[in-house]
Amino acid sequence: MDFYLDIVSVEKRIFSGLVDRIQVSGSEGEMGIYPGHTQLLSIIKPGVIYIFHKNKTEECLYISGGILEVQPSVVSILADVAIRGIDLDRKRVVKAKKQAEEYFKKETTNVKKDDVLLEISKAIAKLRVLEIMDKFKK
């Protein structure tokens, strides 16, 4: 069995096709979505989406957050930002993380620190996607 997955970011459609299952970080924790899953609407936290294709290959994407809608045969993900793992630039991600960490050390207001912590967590999630992609290559 399989289901149709549609992942759309603000900029463009990232993925559209039949899959065996997905794994995503929802507001209540990690969720595995399989064919015939109970209907569900959830907020997605920044992190990794694992896509398990029908041909037994795997793919992962970075997502900065969004909304997950599960219907019996269709799953839709509306993302703020979604980037395929193969499209991430490791050097840029590491540089952005270092800059955010340096800014965090300098910043004195809590409001700005919260924003910087969010940027750091997004960079960490992107690095996690890159690490997973490295494992796929082995």
UniProtKB/Swiss-Prot annotation:
Cite the InterPro entries for this sequence.
ATP_F1_dsu/esu_C_sf, ATP_synth_F1_dsu/esu, ATP_synth_F1_dsu/esu_N, ATPsynth_dsu/esu_N
Lineage start: Bacteria, Pseudomonadati, Pseudomonadota, Gammaproteobacteria, Enterobacterales
Q: Hey, which family's this protein in?
A: Belongs to the ATPase epsilon chain family.
Q: Which UniProt keywords apply?
A: ATP synthesis, Cell membrane, CF(1), Hydrogen ion transport, Ion transport, Membrane, Transport
Instruction: Describe its assembly.
Output: F-type ATPases have 2 components, CF(1) - the catalytic core - and CF(0) - the membrane proton channel. CF(1) has five subunits: alpha(3), beta(3), gamma(1), delta(1), epsilon(1). CF(0) has three main subunits: a, b and c.
Principal cellular location given in the protein's record: membrane
Can you say what this protein is called? ATP synthase epsilon chain
Organism name:
Buchnera aphidicola subsp. Schizaphis graminum (strain Sg)
Where, subcellularly, is it found?
Cell membrane
Q: Which residues cross the membrane?
A: none
Query: What is the name of the gene encoding this protein?
Result: atpC
Q: How does it sit in the bilayer?
A: Peripheral membrane protein
Q: Which NCBIfam families match?
A: ATP_synt_epsi, PRK00571.1-4
Molecular function GO labels = ATP binding; proton-transporting ATP synthase activity, rotational mechanism
Give the protein's function: Produces ATP from ADP in the presence of a proton gradient across the membrane.
Cellular component terms per the entry's GO annotation: plasma membrane; proton-transporting ATP synthase complex
